[in-house]
């Protein structure tokens, strides 16, 4: 097997630059979905069910993108056609989703599963957005696995983590920024504010421009080059030589696949609770949002201001991740760096339940950012190193996405039930802040599980 060549900084940068735009879209979704669906009429106990869709689409789409991109060889490349198609669909959906409440759909009559027509439309748009973002996101991880040697992978994924967090900062601050320049942050009942709508519009434009940049700057290897650098016999692709099913590949997966997956379970369940309940936690603890009908009043100015502040907090988290991503490559012990990062994040989550000062929450989210940076960088470095020379890199990375999606699905299903089981908060509403304590406990459990990883 021929050694993969070293790439200069800009070569590694170009491989992942489109990820910046994809992450803006992902950040807008993460920070605003609970806010959007609460505005459309969802109650806090059902919010977690809307969060089933993102991981569900991920667990379906990403393995398929991995499997079929492993088999794709065309003039535009191997992975790039999939990321471009996904980005194009995402752009269209990002222009529709935040307008769900403005399309004159019925917002009072329950039509299916306790949802109104406007909520069903929003759910359909969310499903399409999740599908397209997953299709655009996965190829960037595969490009690094395909083209970067083992020595540079940690650096490549750190660059990807930096771009991911930089994109997150941009996406998270958009609603706050647009409100600051005078775009309305309130709207009639059932309608999403213009500050959020315009955030999605601008995010969509940046997404497609960034993806176009990567498609122009990156030349994927042809089949002969790929085979030579990945130890596959010449004359046939890895799929033609050996085309096992996904179940067979799972059974043959290295031990690291499963041990890393255990850590992933705790981490991603924790982050799902963060995305679902941060809006309610911040609105209740830091902005004294009034109560209406036994729950936080989502039409109040306090709730919408809190929603913008959540974007700022997520941006602080992303900035913390950017800084921490430059530090973790210097920690010699991979397991120690990984575990320490998750412990810091767990402390950040637990503190959220007790902090009432909006600015003091910056500390909580900086700590959470440490865990986020590690979750983006370490698992794929460890896994792709373990898979080196085994072939089917794209399929394995797609299957590994199950360790991201399944925990979120479990957390989304159980989230509402756990919230109902908790005692009410002092204001008489659902105790969303205590969900942050549970998230912190999960991250610390993940930190302990790191030491079970069988690394190459």
What positions do the PLM features span?
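Intracellular loop-helix junctions on the cytosolic face of multi-pass helical membrane proteins
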Residues: 1-9, 106-109, 113-125, 135-143, ...
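Loop-to-transmembrane helix entry
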Residues: 43-53, 158, 194, 288-318, ...
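Loop-to-transmembrane helix entry/capping segments in MFS-fold secondary transporters
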Residues: 44-45, 119, 150-162, 389-401
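Intracellular juxtamembrane helix-capping segments at the cytosolic ends
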Residues: 135-148, 374-389
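C-terminal transmembrane helical hairpin of 12-TM major facilitator-type secondary transporters
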Residues: 335-379
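A late C-terminal transmembrane helix in Major Facilitator Superfamily
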Residues: 390-422
